[in-house]
Amino acid sequence: MLKVVTFMKQVATGLQVEGNFGTAHVYRSSLNAIIAYCGKADFTFEEVSPEWLKGFEIHLRSRGCSWNTVSTYLRTFRAVYNRAVDLGKAPYVPHLFRSVYTGTRTDHKRALCDEDMKKVFAKLSRTSGVPFAVCQAQELFILMFSLRGMPFVDLAYLRKSDLRDNVITYRRRKTGRPLSVTLTPEAMILVKKYMNRDPSSPYLFPLLKSREGTKEAYREYQLALRSFNQQLMLLGELLGLSDKLSSYTARHTWATTAYYCEIHPGIISEAMGHSSITVTETYLKPFRSKKIDDANKQVLDFVKRSIVGVSAWK
């Protein structure tokens, strides 16, 4: 019968050959977690049961994995299992993954509060000894926010041909959805400041050098992302932010700011290129309770003003 570890390695290799290096990386990380849990070099799909999966979930949590990481590993393994079933190489077990967590949690708030936003968008003084790399990270963060919370991966892979006049047109790498963003004058200033000066490079920004779709380009992207997040962490410490600053923060902050501006979640979803409005709602969920509380306070304040002097309610 088909062996799990062997099959997952084959799937990961196939993904890499197709140029899906990020997905291949997730599959290998999931596989390493599975090997650490089962303690065997390989095993068959027949050995996988609801109890086995629950044990894997408990094992991951005991290692300090977040619920979202647990979900990623389990969903990855479920995809591998389904592929094996489709090939007739693994037995179909109804509701095999029913007892384990495969959802998405929003326990951790990634968006900036108003006070932190003011700090991040304020101009840094180079005379105060702030490193150039930190200033650059701040301005790229502001640019990503200005481009409707563009993910760093999409920024890195933007091509010069994607920019026409003051409009950037591109496809989201995660969902493949086409997006068109009109640049504000402020965003255009930042684009011109950091755009690639190498005439032989197809990329709009000098974050990558190798040809798109190659393993080298993926490695360059990973290094650029790691460096960007390191500089953002330093920026957050320098500004005394209440929450950690990362590449994700620009995207989540744009979504929640739009939400507080009374923009419909459907429009926010379209603007961000989400695969569905459900993804957008995951971004907004942590802030709905506060917005509902604010709405309740507005109602109560209105009632208080209306009945002042005629009610025992004080």
How would you label these PLM feature ranges?
Residues K9-G22, L31-H108, K123-T127:
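N-terminal core-binding DNA-recognition domain of tyrosine recombinases/integrases
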Residues P94-F152:
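Basic, Lys/Arg- and aromatic-enriched nucleic-acid-binding interface segment
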Residues R98, L147, Y157-K193:
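Conserved tyrosine-mediated DNA breakage-rejoining catalytic core shared by Y-recombinases
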